[in-house]
């Protein structure tokens, strides 16, 4: 993927998150993770980013409820772990879901950089899964993946956008259909 900060500056727009490559794997704080990485094209960098929560402000807008719940949301960035070709042993600084970061600089996408193979062996991290429109294609597959997910958050990747929501809220609001929301 292209570097979102570069393009936000070029076209003078808001800077959005650069989370594009969910792994569907979550980790716990202090967990040791093995990551196997194939050939990285010359001049490119690859890393993992662990995304959890931020916030913690009270949802009491009138300041009348001393028992108001803390409001947290998913963070747009988190701890980053640089990867090299071969075996990488990482100790997680915090909990969260893992995203692969392979963002080329400037207009580097025009050079069509080669994909990088990354594998996290079974027994490392916990598989939560995610829905990818390009691969899974149907509401039935979405419903199956969402029903099997165990982490607090669930990721849905469409063609031009990505949702990263509370899994239980998704089960309440959209337990069996997501395609209409992706195609907004």
Descriptions of predicted regions:
Residues 1-132:
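Beta-strand-enriched, solvent-exposed domains that form extended recognition/catalytic surfaces
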Residues 8, 68, 75, 114, ...:
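A sequence-composition feature that detects small, non-aromatic residues
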Residues 119-155:
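Low-complexity, Pro/Ser/Thr- and charge-rich linker/hinge segments at domain boundaries
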Residues 143-148, 152-184:
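Catalytic cores of extracellular degradative/oxidative enzymes
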